[in-house]
């Protein structure tokens, strides 16, 4: 039999009076691709340099069950998430460049989409049929000695 919170349509992490931070964290991590390593969160977009959007997302999910001290609850959840999402080994991938529309491999292949968590992602799109950067190549020719 389901508990009262589930029957009322409330989340499993809310008992009607308080928020179970561990259950909230568990549910949040199941629905969001996020890990914590080397002192930072990482998502399919790359390193999270500002936790404010993450905190805002947590707030959006918590506000249906508004209880006292929401900012402290959010801080506790973020700290708990650091433990729950901790990954010890997250090595760089030197054979690829993650771009806003996919991943470019050094062998020239391109895979569209953002299927996995990455260390960084450049905010530019890969365009395989883009025209040659004539002006840039002229600039480089002026800097470098001919081969």
Where do the PLM segments sit?
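Generic cytosolic/nucleocytoplasmic N-terminal low-complexity/intrinsically disordered segments
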Residues: 1-3, 32, 37, 81
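Residue-level detector of intrinsically disordered/flexible regions characterized by low predicted structural confidence
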Residues: 4-6, 75, 129
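Extended, Lys/Arg-enriched charged tracts that mediate electrostatic binding to polyanionic substrates
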Residues: 9-19, 23, 67-104
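Alpha-helical structural motif
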Residues: 20-21, 54, 58, 73, ...
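P-loop NTPase catalytic core of nucleic-acid-dependent motor ATPases
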Residues: 29-53, 98, 103-147
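Short, charged low-complexity intrinsically disordered segments located at boundaries
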Residues: 52-58, 88-94, 110
């Amino acid at each position: 039999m389901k508990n009262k919170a589930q029957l009322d349509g409330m989340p499993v992490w809310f008992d009607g009076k308080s928020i179970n931070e561990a259950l909230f964290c568990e549910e949040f991590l199941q629905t969001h691709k996020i890990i914590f390593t080397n002192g930072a969160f990482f998502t399919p977009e790359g390193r999270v340099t500002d936790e404010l959007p993450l905190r805002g997302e947590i707030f959006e999910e918590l506000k249906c069950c508004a209880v006292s001290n929401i900012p402290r609850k959010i801080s506790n959840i973020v700290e708990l998430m650091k433990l729950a999402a901790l990954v010890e080994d997250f090595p760089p991938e030197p054979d690829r460049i993650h771009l806003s529309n996919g991943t470019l491999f050094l062998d020239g292949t391109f895979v569209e989409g953002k299927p996995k968590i990455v260390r960084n992602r450049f905010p530019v799109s890969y365009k395989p049929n883009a025209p040659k950067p004539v002006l840039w190549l002229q600039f480089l020719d002026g800097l470098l000695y001919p081969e």
